[in-house]
Amino acid sequence: MVQKPLIKQGYSLAEEIANSVSHGIGLVFGIVGLVLLLVQAVDLNASATAITSYSLYGGSMILLFLASTLYHAIPHQRAKMWLKKFDHCAIYLLIAGTYTPFLLVGLDSPLARGLMIVIWSLALLGILFKLTIAHRFKILSLVTYLAMGWLSLVVIYEMAVKLAAGSVTLLAVGGVVYSLGVIFYVCKRIPYNHAIWHGFVLGGSVCHFLAIYLYIGQA
């Protein structure tokens, strides 16, 4: 049986092109960002923990943008079904991956390491949830993404004391940008709402990358 192509799944063809191109740009950004972080780490003789943290962060960013680009670019229904799961699982990995340099390199305290365990545990549970029963509780996924992101408030005092003001500012701005983007994610009636959401994701990712590259990586 020939698989029917799926050009539209709630989005027009033009919207899907915008969706895939927007995160295709993010994919290039993620690759360049990871290279810059690793080159800087080697130049500064960074610890193995720091290099591992940057690798996890950069790898998770690349994975997220790759998954999203493929999901929106490939038009076949069966592939789309699995790529959608891949895309949503990658969000959990990006959240945990972004935390990693801040907690293990920037703070490196018992509280930060404890939060690190919690965040990665939640990410793995989230992936399991996505692969099994997430279709029954769609709104819960969005709530868990936001909740995981703002768990950083647990270490807000340590960040204010130990991290550069620029780093904390960029981290906070990135979180706000991600959160504001959710408005467009849920407003399906807005033309190109998903591409706009992707723009906010890119903006948040750039803020967090700059916080890590300009401050955490040079501390």
Swiss-Prot record:
Keywords annotated in UniProt: Cell inner membrane, Cell membrane, Membrane, Transmembrane, Transmembrane helix
Entry protein name: UPF0073 inner membrane protein YqfA
NCBIfam families: hlyIII, PRK15087.1
Entry GO CC: plasma membrane
Compartment list: Cell inner membrane
Ranges facing Periplasmic side: 45-53, 112-113, 160-165, 217-219
Family assignment from sequence similarity: Belongs to the UPF0073 (Hly-III) family.
Chief localization: membrane
Any one Gene Ontology BP term: regulation of membrane potential
Any GO molecular function: pore-forming activity
Top-level taxon: Bacteria
TM regions (residue ranges): 24-44, 54-74, 91-111, 114-134, 139-159, 166-186, 196-216
Gene transcribed to yield this protein: yqfA
Topology versus the membrane: Multi-pass membrane protein
InterPro entries to which the protein is assigned, alphabetical: AdipoR/HlyIII-related, Hy-lIII
Keyword flag Cytoplasm: no
Positions in the Cytoplasmic compartment: 1-23, 75-90, 135-138, 187-195
Species for this entry: Escherichia coli (strain K12)
Keyword Signal attached: no
